[in-house]
């Protein structure tokens, strides 16, 4: 047989599959109606497991895993279709609909916002991109920002989530598992690190360099040019600039130009990050879910079984 012959055969089989799939889904609709009438749940795990074992046993031995994967997906699609027909609701769907109905059309501009660090931090720069006239409250730690939202001290909080060079901010992901919050918006901020010193300090005078651990990671190659200089992590880049301003002239900070102006420092070298295209994504969190017009991103955290197909089963629900 030629390749075209095989493809023609595949086309013929696909037409049959599509017809049978439509019949299966129509039958699933009948099952949904029966379950609704008798108050039965959409998911019947015992039936699904029995069916999966049965169809896998019918397949040739070298195709059983493929058959099981195919039917696992079919079960997901069937449940999704039944749930849609039944108009199934959950606390989450109710929360989402309530948020859509109650969230105003315009994102607020003059509100209380929690940020980690001190004035000049990159979180503040991200905050200024998100809000026109924010009332910023600074906190010593990321956890304190989460706590300020939970306790109602601030309506919003701004936190760094991931960087294009250094990757995820792991401390934030760890705290996400502990706190109750919602992501309202996010913003992508270009991050340029600069070597800041007190006026008059020369490169040869530097014995210590301060910055946040993420910034140090983003400037790792650059820092190799300072053998013998002590590299000291601190709370954030603005705190690093503050320490240099209060020091004796032998320290430097990897920080922003806004910190240079704010703390009266000089820039010895600009844009010293290892990657010129260096961006950090910041999230804006709130206590309650708010969905503003134009919202087009969904963020979620999930703990899944450590087994093949567990992530696929979750993602397939979004695709369906």
Give the positions of each predicted feature:
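Domain-level signature for soluble enzymes in the chorismate/prephenate branch of the shikimate pathway
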Residues: 1-320
């Amino acid at each position: 047989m030629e390749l075209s012959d095989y493809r023609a055969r595949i086309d013929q089989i696909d037409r049959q599959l599509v017809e049978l799939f439509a019949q299966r889904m129509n039958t699933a609709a009948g099952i949904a109606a029966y379950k609704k009438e008798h108050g039965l749940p959409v998911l019947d795990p015992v039936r699904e497991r029995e069916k999966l074992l049965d169809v896998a046993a019918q397949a040739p031995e070298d195709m059983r895993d493929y058959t099981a994967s195919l039917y696992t997906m079919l079960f997901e699609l069937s449940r999704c279709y039944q749930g849609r027909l039944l108009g199934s609701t959950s606390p989450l769907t109710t929360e989402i609909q309530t948020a859509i109905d109650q969230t105003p059309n315009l994102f607020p501009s003059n509100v209380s916002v929690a940020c980690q660090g001190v004035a000049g931090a990159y979180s503040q720069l991200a905050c200024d991109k998100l809000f026109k006239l924010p009332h910023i409250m600074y906190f010593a730690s990321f956890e304190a920002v989460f706590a300020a939202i939970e306790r109602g001290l601030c309506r919003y909080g701004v936190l760094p989530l991931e960087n294009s060079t250094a990757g995820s901010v792991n401390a934030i992901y760890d705290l996400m598992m502990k706190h109750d919050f919602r992501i309202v918006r996010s913003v992508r901020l270009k991050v340029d690190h600069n070597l800041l010193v007190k006026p008059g300090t020369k490169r040869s005078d530097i014995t210590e360099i301060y910055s946040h651990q993420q910034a140090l990671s983003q400037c790792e190659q650059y820092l190799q040019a300072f053998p013998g200089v002590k590299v000291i992590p601190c709370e954030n880049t603005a705190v690093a600039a503050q320490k240099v301003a209060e020091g004796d002239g032998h320290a430097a900070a990897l920080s922003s130009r806004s910190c240079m102006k704010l703390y009266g420092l000089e820039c010895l070298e600009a844009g010293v990050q290892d990657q010129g295209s260096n961006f950090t994504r910041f999230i804006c969190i709130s206590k309650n879910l708010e969905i503003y017009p134009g919202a087009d991103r969904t963020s979620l955290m999930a703990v899944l079984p450590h087994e093949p197909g567990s992530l696929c089963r979750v993602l397939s629900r979004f695709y369906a």
